[in-house]
């Protein structure tokens, strides 16, 4: 049933997926409405609950898109191309406005949500942002926060646990999945090897003195630490500057490394799912046990029906990207992972050198917005967008 809010909101966040579906039903009344999605996979998940809506995206044939473009009407579920449809909707809704997929794949550097806001303003129609985790840029908009179930979370401190890329504790949980005939997902930040210099004893990582972003390790020559934001360079230290440990080395297992390590330790079938190659997951979709090792492409893939465990062997690989939005993206990723299985939340296991990071603390507390306000304040202090 539709969930009707007392007044038209500028943003709605939180809740379970089906609650956000109910909110969207409450926002879409009679007449024409435009709903924008970052990806076709998410569009299709919502579309299953809106039989009267019409999809409009690049995955459709040219003749189908052309025919609808000439006479757009009704409730339209679209990717970014929907902004060009020649009609005046009664309202415009942007779903998951913080998604990186809203960045247009061209040299324009355009970002869809601000364009949607401009279109709504020019047409004089209301606009609502609907997402599990709000973008920092829309935090100050008036709206509603739906209650979010507390995640099932286990933080594994890599400064104390042994075993890499999978610790003994995580391996024991994977073997439980194996014994019970369930399914697991193992997520890596990269297809190959990342270049994050981390101390295995204290978790120290070199940061840029100017940008407060992690320095990336480049192997060429004698090696160098480079800031991908401003170009700052420095020599990598031989010992950890914080604790003096010699265990300072590049870390970051890629998909293939993790897959090989698990295949040696488990009798379950281990599948690969990344942007550059995807195994056939049909056996898993039929309910058979197994493990999928992949990148964030898994979030756009099919939902596994018996998913019990989601493991990030090096969660810091997502957190320490050389981009000031990395922590916000990581925060959004973790909450998205809690919804990988419809109806029941899987156990989320994070192997990390920084279990005390504010993103992890917010997830433990079940707080979606509190961390984002901290992030907003930090960006303002550094004059990062949306401050500039």
Question: Where are the regions a protein language model picked out?
Answer:
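Inter-lobe coupling/hinge segments of SF2-like helicase ATPases
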Residues: 2-74, 78-388
């Amino acid at each position: 049933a539709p969930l009707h809010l007392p007044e038209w909101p500028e943003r709605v966040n939180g809740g379970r997926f089906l609650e956000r579906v109910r909110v969207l039903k409450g926002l879409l009344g009679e007449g024409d409405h435009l709903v924008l999605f970052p990806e076709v996979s998410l569009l299709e998940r919502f579309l299953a609950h809106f039989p009267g809506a019409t999809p409009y995206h690049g995955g459709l044939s040219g003749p189908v898109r052309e025919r609808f473009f000439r006479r757009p009407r009704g409730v339209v579920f679209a990717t970014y191309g929907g902004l060009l449809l020649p009609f005046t909707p009664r309202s415009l809704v942007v779903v998951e406005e913080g998604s990186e997929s809203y960045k247009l794949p061209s040299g324009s550097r355009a970002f869809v949500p601000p364009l949607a806001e401009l279109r709504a303003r020019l047409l004089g129609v209301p606009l609502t942002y609907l997402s599990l985790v709000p973008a920092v840029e829309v935090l100050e908009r008036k709206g509603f926060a739906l209650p979010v179930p507390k995640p099932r979370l286990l933080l594994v401190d890599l400064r104390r646990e042994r075993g890499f890329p999978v610790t003994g504790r995580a391996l024991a949980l994977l073997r439980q999945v194996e014994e019970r005939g369930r399914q697991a997902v193992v997520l890596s930040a990269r297809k190959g090897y990342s270049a994050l210099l981390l101390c295995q004893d204290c978790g120290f990582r070199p940061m840029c003195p100017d940008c407060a972003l992690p320095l990336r390790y480049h192997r060429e020559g004698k090696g160098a630490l480079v800031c991908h934001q401003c170009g700052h360079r420095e020599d990598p230290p031989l010992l950890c500057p914080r604790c003096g440990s010699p265990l300072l080395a590049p870390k970051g297992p890629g998909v293939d490394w993790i897959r090989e390590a698990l295949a040696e330790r488990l009798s379950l079938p281990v599948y690969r799912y990344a942007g550059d190659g995807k195994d056939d997951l049909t056996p898993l979709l039929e309910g058979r046990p197994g493990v999928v090792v992949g990148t964030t492409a898994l979030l756009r893939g099919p939902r596994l029906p018996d998913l019990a465990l989601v493991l990030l062997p090096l969660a810091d690989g997502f957190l320490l990207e050389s981009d000031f939005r990395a922590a916000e993206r990581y925060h959004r990723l973790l909450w998205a992972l809690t919804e990988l299985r419809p109806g029941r939340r899987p156990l989320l296991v994070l192997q990390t050198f920084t279990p005390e990071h504010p993103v992890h603390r917010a997830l433990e507390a079940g707080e979606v917005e509190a961390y984002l306000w901290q992030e907003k304040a930090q960006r303002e202090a550094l004059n990062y967008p949306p401050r500039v």
